[in-house]
């Protein structure tokens, strides 16, 4: 009896993706097979993992396999696996009604000219079936549900039916592709064998092709007569007696038989010696492991022997995946095998988060086969393996660094990871620090390492100077650099948000302290004459410092005469152990931040004034003449707010700041306030009735 068929609509994004796949011309449609085999392999991994703790999970189908069946009579290609299978809700959700996080990103990538072969990286590889098929039928059986059939011609909807009459799978999934008329090449044995060799040779389950075998068999005429007896029956023939007496002649007939032909007979690549493996073989293995369409950037193949034995191959990709730092997604990076048996992927205990971009496999001789995720967390063997993997990864990065061009590519993609490593990995911190690269006041367009910086340090220089900020452009003309540049000191530009965290942990390099140009405590060597002049200026400007402090109140902790600013009138520095302006900006941008922390970490600002600046000198004269002069207060507020901006802070009230600038423009243009009073009706006055500067209210 036919079961009831339910119809579902594809989720909008998936529908959009399908229409892109069907209606756009792609030259490399062949990748569909790689994607479907990869999905089968994942399903087999899942059932194998489940069976480690419960052997009965394999009862319905003890063999783990992938079968490929081309059928020229019906123009269909089927890919069958004995994996975990799907329940009805899996079918509905995974194949149509719930879009993966990667669906939108993949479409954006396609629109930007990316290759369709990227599809697997975005978790939507199944839909590549529609590159070659006009109709797709998925029959599946999960241990916890009945057998179901999913079917769609990608016209906006799909159907799901309980399968009571079809061939029963026992467990697993069969995907049948009804090929388009111009895609019948994928029924050819040669083409399918080539594709498996090219893309899926290193899948760890046997991939068998249903092949047609034609053999020639010799039979005598006698046997032939026997075989034809039925056909001949009822016919009247004249038998030539002479012929009958002649020697029976032999004749050949063609016999057609079918058999399974295993296409991936390679032994695991990691068991072979590195020197015997070609670059192409590593590339093929990397692609089958990661679904990447590009080759890897670098590879490390090694084995550890002694008290502990394991083999590993680690790869560094050429690009960072689109969701590298997506904390909701478990990165599927290192596959764990125990004595050639696959145990699990995304084994978080094998590699720290900062190395989450490294792909590869680890095959251990010592772990128990039935190890669970819970046991992994406590496992001492795993901790030793992890330590070795981290060490080998760092070695690999140094190998990449030997080629400047390769390292620039690597650094562009994964510098954030290295900086996260500085923050998280205290054991390897000093080693990772050697891999960091920054622009600096002397490096031009090139990046420089800390090691190179140290070799260029001036005689007598004992500290490494750096400045943090939003971008290279934002910091290269910062007032904080004026004195350092004038004295010929090199300053590193740390303009990545994560630099703030990294430099907080990396307090020194090769015995040289890292000092921020934007914080208190910047001490530059001065001659006796310079020191004497500085003392005189401090005395001369002491009165102005007090006036500024009175005007600004608790907006600043103190006001001092600067020895770091050369051209700008003033700047705002932060405490040595508090947040920099850049860090404050980063923390404000975090939606889920703990605002209580901001109170004590965003340290009080110190205003440093430049006594050599003509604006400051004029301000000093006015303040000395009359400290209650309203223009002094207005100018102090304007200087403070401008210093907030040039020092990298944000304004609490940009509108009042704007109003103040407009007033200054009017003064400069000699526009009478009364004439423009009507136009300015909605502007706050600079002075209120009490004679207090409105500007003071800006915080």
Curated annotation (Swiss-Prot):
Keywords, sorted A to Z: ATP-binding, Chaperone, Cytoplasm, Nucleotide-binding, Stress response
Protein encoded by which gene: HSP81-2
NCBIfam families according to UniProt: PRK05218.1
HAMAP family listed in its UniProt record: HSP90
Keyword Acetylation recorded: no
Residues engaged in binding ATP: 39, 81, 126, 373
Subunit record text: Homodimer.
Ranges of Basic and acidic residues composition bias in the record: 228-237
UniProt-listed GO biological process terms: cellular response to heat; protein folding; protein stabilization
Record-level GO cellular component terms: cytosol; perinuclear region of cytoplasm; plasma membrane; protein-containing complex
Pfam families reported in the protein's UniProt record: HATPase_c_3, HSP90
Family in the record: Belongs to the heat shock protein 90 family.
Gene3D superfamilies xrefs: 3.30.230.80, 3.40.50.11260, Heat shock protein 90, C-terminal domain, Histidine kinase-like ATPase, C-terminal domain
Organism: Oryza sativa subsp. japonica
Biased composition (Acidic residues): 674-690
Known function: Molecular chaperone that promotes the maturation, structural maintenance and proper regulation of specific target proteins involved for instance in cell cycle control and signal transduction. Undergoes a functional cycle that is linked to its ATPase activity. This cycle probably induces conformational changes in the client proteins, thereby causing their activation. Interacts dynamically with various co-chaperones that modulate its substrate recognition, ATPase cycle and chaperone function.
Positions of short motif TPR repeat-binding: 695-699
GO MF terms held by the record: ATP binding; ATP hydrolysis activity; ATP-dependent protein folding chaperone; unfolded protein binding
Protein localization: Cytoplasm
Protein name, per record: Heat shock protein 81-2
Region of interest (Disordered), ranges: 215-250, 674-699
SUPFAM superfamilies the record matches: ATPase domain of HSP90 chaperone/DNA topoisomerase II/histidine kinase (SSF55874), HSP90 C-terminal domain (SSF110942), Ribosomal protein S5 domain 2-like (SSF54211)
Domain notes: The TPR repeat-binding motif mediates interaction with TPR repeat-containing proteins.
